[in-house]
Amino acid sequence: MKYINSFLFFCVIVLVGCNQQPTFTISGTITDGQDQKIYLEHTSLVGTTIIDSCVIENNGKFLLESAAPEYPDFYRIRIGQQSLPLIIDSIEQIQINSTLAELSYTQDISGSESCLQIAKLRAIARKASRDELREASKQMIVANPASLVAYYAVFLKQNGLAVWDITQASDRRLFQAVATSFDLHWPDYDRTI
């Protein structure tokens, strides 16, 4: 009887563990965001979907959570009109600290190198010349054309204008590098061009 109870307990633990889906979390502090609602949104090719939300605590802390995606993909956190794009890959635990006013440009991000890289690109786009932004984004594209950072970089805009122009032969090579890399690494991914 003792062995049967132990076996049943073991089976229950295994079944519970198998039913739990892997998740990722985004947490942090928005110092002046108390009592505001923060949203976690998935940004797909067909639109944006709210995945999770919470009210920021009095001390500015928040926690958002969702099931891990099958492929790395784009998400964002949003408070009102302020948003921060993120790349989520698997079961990451991302930490973000910012003020509400600087949320869209914060670089105080840990737990995801991809998120930090696109935050750096956004900061460069905000303050640097077009040539400096082109050089910085080109380096990120060439370094890993199969990454979502490269995908983000080829579609990057500065002041509402595309940084890269697919109709220009020199720019087209970067688009081709990303498209070919995605096709090789993720042929069934919906972002494969």
Listing of model-derived features with the role each one plays in the protein:
Residues 18-144:
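A non-transmembrane, solvent-exposed segment enriched in polar/low-complexity residues
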Residues 141, 145, 167-170:
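Structural signature of alpha-solenoid helical repeat scaffolds
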Residues 137-141, 154, 179-183:
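Amphipathic alpha-helical segments within well-ordered protein domains
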Residues 169-193:
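N-proximal helix/coil linker or "cap" segments that precede and/or mark the start of modular domains
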Residues 17, 162-165:
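Secretory-pathway/luminal and periplasmic proteins that interact with or process carbohydrate-rich
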Residues 145-161:
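Amphipathic alpha-helical repeat scaffolds of TPR domains
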Residues 1-29:
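Bacterial Sec-dependent N-terminal signal peptides
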